[in-house]
Amino acid sequence: MNKDLFLQAAPILQEIQDNGYEAYYVGGAVRDYLMDRPIHDIDITTSASPDEIEGIFTNTIPIGKEHGTINVVYNHENYEVTTFRAEGEYEDHRRPSEVIFVRDLYKDVERRDFTINAIAMDNQFNIKDYFNGYSDIQNKLIKTVGNPYERFNEDALRILRGLRFKSQLRFEIDSDTYKAMQEKIADTEYLSIERIIIELRKLLEGTDASIVYPLLNELQFFKYVPFFKSFNTSAIEIKDPIKLELLIAIMSFKQSSNISLSMLKISNDSKKKIQKYITLFNKLPDIKTKKALKVFVYDYGISTLSYILDMKDTLAANQIELGHPLIFNIESIDEINQNLIIRQRSDMMVNGKDILESLNQKGGPWLKDVLRNIECAIINQEIPNQKSEIINWVKTHVEI
């Protein structure tokens, strides 16, 4: 078990304890430590109030002070230190109406979502496990802390989180917990699309995404998300962990949907990736020669095409053709990528101005086509990437 990150944070716990308060590691980091999984972020919980934490440490940032969280900067690292808290009634199935600071660890962990996330650990690596979370880890079981209906009623996102943990950890979901998921799934319509997307990404990229995706359909989750309700999501099959952008591209391509991606509130980069995948799907059947593949590698890049090949089972399951395997394969793509003469239009030794001057013409839509033809000719080594050679080629091949 890797203790390094905990040992780095141990002086913070010790300092809090030296000032007369309790302090523990808590949450996903403890769970992953007990499972011997990689640990990324350390969360600390304490009986000290936010004001008391600010009094103990000199370098702090009040990132969420009203909710009990102070960022403590120690050895150039940031650690979130959160006061033990209980929560009032939840509003809209997503946020508590009030946060109440308490001095009792039990009160703090009993508000958490799943038993596997409700384990606290001190700086001597002794655990406080009020809800048998460690036993559930050993039994590979996802189970809510207390009544599952209450937990999901408090925050419907916990339903998605439970499914995400099943996908990532390859655990089973406790039968009572799953029954409550079925009965409370409609409450996910109250969630913001931003929160849904964060969990959905992690779920789809989890090891058992191919098992959990059908559960989303079984629970009828997608009908409560406006963007997805117009798709027949149960007609889509997943064979491997998948990026959200590729899944949406497959849905859109297979079902010819023109639904606006703006409903998802994802980044422009993500939207471009989705459109790129859809365009790629339309062109894949045309990749029948090495010449066509060269231009394809230039247009889409080794990273995108390697990923598409990795996802060939999922694409095939959704009747998306990949092109002939003797042409479209990783060895051919690698070889072409290593030997590309140019990698982007700016690598060409001519530009639009050069073409206009050489032909004594004014600009127009034709120029874009000419530049594209030059690109393809250079890529396929029909002409060298030299200005004089390109100009001569244009004069003999271009009709305006």
Swiss-Prot record:
Entry keywords, A to Z: ATP-binding, Magnesium, Metal-binding, Nucleotide-binding, Nucleotidyltransferase, RNA repair, RNA-binding, Transferase, tRNA processing
Residues involved in Mg(2+) binding: D41, D43
Superkingdom of the source species: Bacteria
InterPro entries listed in its UniProt record: Bact_CCA-adding_enz_type3_sf, CCA-adding_enz_C, CCA-adding_enz_firmicutes, NT_sf, PolA_pol_head_dom, PolyA_RNA-bd
EC number annotated for this UniProt entry: 2.7.7.72
Reaction catalysis annotation: a tRNA precursor + 2 CTP + ATP = a tRNA with a 3' CCA end + 3 diphosphate; a tRNA with a 3' CCA end + 2 CTP + ATP = a tRNA with a 3' CCACCA end + 3 diphosphate
Residues reported in the UniProt entry to bind CTP: G28, R31, R112, D155, R158, R161, R164
A GO biological-process term: tRNA 3'-terminal CCA addition
Note: A single active site specifically recognizes both ATP and CTP and is responsible for their addition.
Protein family according to the UniProt entry: Belongs to the tRNA nucleotidyltransferase/poly(A) polymerase family. Bacterial CCA-adding enzyme type 3 subfamily.
Complexes and interactors: Homodimer.
Role noted for this protein: Catalyzes the addition and repair of the essential 3'-terminal CCA sequence in tRNAs without using a nucleic acid template. Adds these three nucleotides in the order of C, C, and A to the tRNA nucleotide-73, using CTP and ATP as substrates and producing inorganic pyrophosphate. tRNA 3'-terminal CCA addition is required both for tRNA processing and repair. Also involved in tRNA surveillance by mediating tandem CCA addition to generate a CCACCA at the 3' terminus of unstable tRNAs. While stable tRNAs receive only 3'-terminal CCA, unstable tRNAs are marked with CCACCA and rapidly degraded.
The name this protein goes by in its record: CCA-adding enzyme
Organism for this UniProt entry: Staphylococcus carnosus (strain TM300)
